[in-house]
Amino acid sequence: MKLLIEKIKLALQKRTGTAQQKKSHDSWVAKGYRKEPTVTFVLQSHDKSLQVCHVLPKLRQYADAEIIVIDDGSKEEHTRRLAAALTGANEFLLRANDLFENVTYDKAIRLANGKYIALMQDDDDFDGTGWVEQAVRLFEQHPKMVILGGKGGLDITFEDDRKRAHGGASQATGDFCFVTSVNRAPMWINRQLFMQHLHHIDFRFAPFQFDDYELCARAWLCGLQVGWYDAGFRSLTAGGMRLWNNAFTQEQSERNGRLLYQLYADERDRIRQRVRESNA
């Protein structure tokens, strides 16, 4: 019945010449859509639309960018708020239902048109756009760098007795350096290098945990580089979704720690040698 009513309504509009808004090429151009922006900001949101709306005006200060918000929660109020807030021609809403970051970040990377992609969390906060400009400069200075982290720059610890791997000691020094791995967020991606050499975030680590370490290890073995700088982020919340999912997080840490070990324990020396050579 609803479809029939809608069909009649549209037929009347067409016959009478009334429409919601007249479209034209000029009105489309006036939207200011950028086909190839320098930067794509990707924000993963899990029922934290207020936090996302807080940082949107800050992200818009960097003009040559697009914004993709992943609405990965389960509450309709957040979907409505985000849809209302994303008003620009280069602002998009990607809807998912509790799939978590492994899947949704990978989807968003394929949607993004930016040369450099910043993967962000819904509790990230920052001042100004200096962290963006610095990241772009670092990518331009290091054409083999596929990943740039702005949070932690870490070694990967391999526990041979337990056959597990996880984030290890900090390797971050100075204003910038190459490191074994970085964790989110932000995590910057050189999109062209990612698509040519890495192709995807490893789905075996879904729904979350340690896929960022795996991606970094794979990058080094592909002859690419992973860098770190201090983005100066701070948190808007007391803890992310893991605060309420401790058992789930522990389960994922055990499972993915074993997988990370299986994949890269035998490659640890080669990876670390490439990090040392890059920093030389």
Regions found by a protein language model. Name each.
Residues K2-P57:
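N-proximal low-complexity "stem/linker" segments adjacent to membrane-targeting elements
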Residues I70-R80:
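A conserved acidic beta->alpha catalytic loop
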